[in-house]
Amino acid sequence: MTSNESAVSQALGVHSEVGRLRKVLVCSPGLAHRRLTPTNSDELLFDDVMWVENAQRDHAAFVGELRRRGVEVVELHDLLAQIMALPEARAWLLDRKITANQVGIGLIDAARAYLETLSPRELAEYLVGGLATSDLPEDFRSPHLALARESTGAREYLMPPLPNTLYTRDTTCWLYGGLTLNPLYWSARHDETLLMKAIYTFHPDFKGSKVWWGDPERDWGQATFEGGDIMPVGNGVVLMGMSERTSRQAITQVAAALFRSGAAEHVVVAGMPKLRSAMHLDTVFTFADRDVVTLYPRIMDAVHTFSLRPGDRAPGFDVVDEGSTPFVDVVAKALGLPKLRVVETGGDAYASERQQWDSGNNAVAVEPGVVFTYDRNTLTNALLREARVEVVTIVGAELGRGRGGGHCMTCPLVREPVDF
């Protein structure tokens, strides 16, 4: 690696969807997924329980292949353990996690005292994996614990597990030279962004990062924003899905913040149906090369597209209704391309619906024309290869049980721009 390449790799920022991926955040399956049961999986947003050992094996293979492709991979548990070795970071996070509203007024002292005895690595495991009422040793138990144990579902935890941390894409978005700290749609995921704020506040590799918008310590009301809906594609353009999880209220605030800072010049909004199967834009649309996208036409053909651009009048941007112009055509024009080559979900009506459900269009690129996808989506993968895209497969039988693929499982931290 040249000195110039080294400098690029260390400058946090994401400048495209397919430029060379230099650094990425992932979260390995672990304790949080061992906490999933048939009783609580719906509440924790998983369709089924995981075979955790196989999920760990498959995730490790995914990470290993990313590294072989030259990507620096950092892992959420590791980053948390590193900052939990810092007394000020530990105090900051436990002050916000161990509260009357979280653990109950009668268990604050006992839960805090127990967590303070743990090593940084053990504490990181509990912060992601959850603290069950049964985890407190006898020395830290009180009469209040019996009351807590009568609770059901995820509420039997003093700190609920966060299994959706597997999908690191959603909690933060690097948009060119800064990031957003996202208020997530479901309450089961809210504390994920708090963990990320701790990392960005205290970890030496991330301190000083520019935050465009968002703060998990605020109530954002109807303004919800998730990274699976957000794509900084280059040329100052950001794609945003207005979906089940990402609201108009958040999109307009983020767009205004990006325009004020000069970070972006055009936000293309995809108005989507509110469906779990298409919860985010990246479940039905991703880039595979500079001019190649893979998409699920049954959803994308019905998308209503809007363009937001900086404006002189309040609230600081203008809205253009793109009418009947297809989303892909609006995106192509924004990037200065005559058109985008489209790879649709493979198979007949039945097969394509199954493949989309199994994240067939949820590709993540490591460089132009090289993507990772789940192995089970054989028909879509074959079509990508016909379009001269190199497809590296991930075993997806277990990792996809929360409805996410390679794009969902990666939060790019450093990605190079591309020329259009």
From Swiss-Prot:
Keywords: Arginine metabolism, Cytoplasm, Hydrolase. It catalyses: L-arginine + H2O = L-citrulline + NH4(+). Its EC number is 3.5.3.6. Signal peptide: none annotated. It comes from the Bacteria. PANTHER family: ARGININE DEIMINASE. Belongs to the arginine deiminase family. This is Arginine deiminase. It comes from Streptomyces coelicolor (strain ATCC BAA-471 / A3(2) / M145).
